[in-house]
């Protein structure tokens, strides 16, 4: 296919990219609400394709410690995807899922095994919801791996696909996600397809 610039691609596919974000967030909100037993609203203020090298500046300070839930994707497309969440939001969601009340977290970077497991499940639901929406829009079969979770600097987490798995691409789909419950939570879904898969996605949209 013709290799358009990112600005041209975002202009051409703005509606379908937003639809992927809206459908995915709606499915994720329903699933998470059922888990925590309270109403959850999710909004997608921003969806765009961008250079992988600019992801760090798009999501905030690269030296900031965040929670990252990471999965590989395969079959019709190859690449990786992740969901990033700030520490305060992570503790809030973990407390909700584990039914903890009035907990004071003195060490924000510390999560126990149960908390990490709960957050991994949240990340799995959100990434699976967006992935399902993308698969429906493109008629591509996209299979996720088992997720894993880590707490580290944003720059370190964003480098995982290339360092750990040799997955290399220069484009990413970034979906900014706002989760509205008792407090507002902002997270980022990122799909980083390999170069051939990137063009396959665009051809299928």
Role assignments for model-derived ranges:
Residues 2-27, 31-205:
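Composition-driven recognition of glycine/serine/threonine/acidic- and proline-rich low-complexity segments
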